[in-house]
Amino acid sequence: GKTWSEPRLVTGFDEQTACLVRLPDNTILLVFGHKTDGSGQRFMASFDEGRSWSRTVYQLGQNCQYASTVLLTGNRLVSVSHRIIDGVGIFHARQWSAPKKTAFSDGGFWTPRPAEPLGVARSR
């Protein structure tokens, strides 16, 4: 965190609540919420410190938002997310493992373009 690169667009418009997780092999997973075609959690991977990201995007769960993910022992991950059903807030936890590096490579990689600010939100 001593230095930061220029901001870049990685996931696309209307993706939110991102969480970065570094695996023991130095793979970085970007877990994020999406609202572009429904809502849910997805993730993608970088094997070069975030310079490029997998074109392959994996669906983690649907109809859930605001997930946070942590690494457990044995390369297992747990994602906790929030969902509202009939006006009641419900938390979900999913334990999972990232696919092998070769599974990501099948979809290729892309280099994110610079991010452009969309505006400033203000609250009172």
Language model regions located:
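Asp-box/BNR beta-propeller blade signature and adjacent active/binding-site loops
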Residues: G1-R124
